[in-house]
Amino acid sequence: MQKTMTRHLSRNRKPHEKVSHVPRRGPRTYQDPCDPGWYVVNSRRGVAPQPTPTSGSLGRKPYNPGCPSRKWTKKIIAAPKHGFYSAKDHGYWVPKVQAQKKYNPPRKVVGGGRSYKDVLSTPAKIQIKPTPESILLAQKIQNSTFKSRGKVTLSQEKIPLINRFQELLIEKELMEDVEESQPFVANDSRAQHLFCKKVLRKVGRREILVCPITNEESHVNLKTGIKARIVDSMGSVVHEENIPAYNRGHVVKSMRKRIVHERESKPIPVIGSFSDRAIRVLCDDHTDELASASSVPSEWKPSKNQRAVPCLLQNESATVVSAKPDWYAPVKVCTHKQYMKVQRVFLDAMFIMRALRFHIDAKILRETWVKCWLQVHRKNVAFPGWMIAPLLSGTVPCEQEFLLPRVNETRAFATVCYA
């Protein structure tokens, strides 16, 4: 008997044949598409459940009215919304679910207590102890914007950020000597590590050069060797086939990455802490009277017909500033994509300035830097703090920032940048 049974079960059945030993499912008593899963609850009243009679006896009453039947009490069940069908209770047992209390953030106090939402939604204030140079520079920036967004808040009563260019007082004898840095020359030996040393590998019958790290085939010809030039004082390496593009001023990306839009550039680590929150630059009327006109290059001076328009406060009526010039729009907080774009511009500018800093005079370098920022500023985006801070501290990516000691000088990692 046992044998025939097993043979019967394991026999290959034809697709149209009914499987005898699998019980037929009752109808789905629980179908809520919003719920994480489907639960199948087999009703206990035969295969096709009859509607429960409303009149007359419903059968024996359960011993535990209002309570779940004994079979559920020892288990913790994730029950569907309408509970489980229980034969003993003649119906559905709906578990009593404790309602989760919604978290209410503390309300705003009239005295100016700030909830976390306020902190997240209000623009950050730049907290830098202003030096005369940084104030002058901030005023230059204010004047220079053709579509001027006005005043940058320099708040003195707030805790200042650590200026990353402050000289650190460190005993000279504890510091190791730093050799004087020479600008890179063409094909400098110091940059040899930048050309990845390729290794011969046999692939099939061919011997090819392979980069030992990334394991990919080199485009370098075995006979001619590496064709690349060091193009600037930072020891940047450009391969020969990319040189025309480099000369045209394109940013040369390495094609090693599948995603082309991802840059190689990494932001420079900074001493001190800058907030990454976007900084909104508010508008102010009196910008052009502040800086002396002689100190500002002529192309930075605001033209008379476009002067900065004060921002409308919330409580002011719109009639106060009736005729806004057509370029005027309040500063928006940027999206992530815009932020990345601005960051790319920033980093590109940073690298260009870095490359130029042995070749041009510091003042021109600084002006170029600020002008480069005006290009971004006119695009009407909110700056993140780490971008605007170097502007306000009156610094540029100049030789001091990149920690290159001067001739016979030993110095710590954070240095003064003279504005």
Curated annotation (Swiss-Prot):
Residues 1-27 have a biased composition (Basic residues). Transmembrane segments: none annotated. It comes from the Viruses. It comes from Tomato black ring virus (strain E). Disulfide bonds: none annotated. InterPro entries: SatRNA_48 (IPR035312). Belongs to the nepovirus satellite RNA 48 kDa protein family. Residues 1-66 are annotated as: Disordered. This is Satellite RNA 48 kDa protein.
